[in-house]
Amino acid sequence: MLRYPYFYRTYNRLFSHFVDSGASNLDVCPHTIHTAVALHTESKAVEGTALCGPQKVYSSEEKELEAMAKLHIPVMVDQVVHCLAPQKGQVFLDMTFGSGGHTRAILQKEPDVMVYALDRDPVAYAIAEQLSRLYPTQIQALLGQFSQAEALLMKAGVQPGTIDGILMDLGCSSMQLDAPERGFSLRKDGPLDMRMDGDRYPDTPTASDVVNALDQQALASILRAYGEEKHAKKIASAIIQARSTYPISRTQQLASIVAGAFPPSAVYARKDLLQRSTHIATKTFQALRIFVNNELNELYAGLRTAEKFLKTGGRLVALSFHSLEDRIVKRFLLGISMTERFNLSIRQKVKQTSQLDSDQETEERHSVRAPLKWELIHKKVLTPEDQDVQDNPRGRSAKLRAAIKL
């Protein structure tokens, strides 16, 4: 059953420390288990820093990709374009190309721009490649993770401090959720996979590997840290009990196991922001997806890359879909360390200090404080308007933060 014994040992060594220090404490453990697995992989995919990607997309596949792209509705697209404010001759980086909705909107607003279209998903990369053939001087497709973005950009000839606007549309795309074979959705049965990179890295653990290999305490830690699941112990116990009879390999199989740990009345008792019933396993699926794809560490790496490649006055727009993502984005823009317990910005700390310390001590603290690196475009986070939610209910939990690099 344990297809990845090294994965199991490395988890016990790294993740327990990661959880103890806080789910968003990225300074304490900047590399999770996935880094260690990659170092001990004998069969690796094509290097993520290569500009080449999947094999050529043929006409029948092109039609399918085009249909997928048309079905996807980009989240808060008007607000995104407004915040990026594209101007003639500017350069943009879409770090989560997906099906290209936001990139298309940027080009519709201002055709005379260059967009580097990055995505870790080979399917999204294929769509970006297809679109780049229609707009060869406006779009260049890049295949890779956030942590590989710097090398990809340098290889493409993009120097630090030269990009005018960067977009990050975080989380799982509708395209991934709607493909049962990808294993992201509990509503459609498929293999319990959840790897955003697809088969590019064959030895990367799948969600099935996680639920079949880790012990109860480890599983509960993942559900609690990444799904903010208050019933983490109960769900982990149900998973352990079920897998002792048969391996857990399908999405709806896992959903049924989680549901079986609760009375029938509780399975759809939770409500989303639209007051619609949600399945009790939703947070479990979120937690596994975040863990499998190392999403929080990748997000932090992506934010650091964005800061490095944006020019002074360049704009960063980040769309997040749950509190863990939003907390990291907020702290990064406000200059708050990921190890801090409270979300106090540098400016707030200085103000707090001035109320408590003497004038001399305050002056000393002012002289050593870190400079602010971002100016927020909006004081408060933006959320979807009613029409946005009506057009795209999946984007109901979106939070948009935008800032200008100082």
UniProtKB/Swiss-Prot annotation:
Enzyme class: transferase
Pfam family, one: Methyltransf_5
A GO molecular-function annotation: rRNA (cytosine-N4-)-methyltransferase activity
GO annotation (BP), single: rRNA base methylation
Keyword terms, alphabetized: Methyltransferase, Mitochondrion, Phosphoprotein, S-adenosyl-L-methionine, Transferase, Transit peptide
Compartmental location: Mitochondrion matrix
E.C. number(s) listed in UniProt: 2.1.1.-
Entry keyword Isomerase: no
Gene Ontology CC, one term: mitochondrial matrix
Binding site for S-adenosyl-L-methionine: G100, G101, H102, D119, F146, D169, Q176
Reactions this protein catalyses: cytidine(839) in 12S rRNA + S-adenosyl-L-methionine = N(4)-methylcytidine(839) in 12S rRNA + S-adenosyl-L-homocysteine + H(+)
Range annotated as the organelle transit peptide: 1-22
Family annotation (InterPro entries): RsmH, SAM-dep_MeTrfase_MraW_recog, SAM-dependent_MTases_sf
Phosphoserine PTM positions: S358
Family recorded in the similarity comment: Belongs to the methyltransferase superfamily. RsmH family.
Summary of the function given for this chain in its UniProt record: N4-methylcytidine (m4C) methyltransferase responsible for the methylation of position C839 in mitochondrial 12S rRNA. Involved in the stabilization of 12S rRNA folding, therefore facilitating the assembly of the mitochondrial small ribosomal subunits.
Protein's name in the database: 12S rRNA N(4)-cytidine methyltransferase METTL15
Originating species: Mus musculus
Source lineage: Eukaryota, Metazoa, Chordata, Craniata, Vertebrata
Gene behind this protein: Mettl15
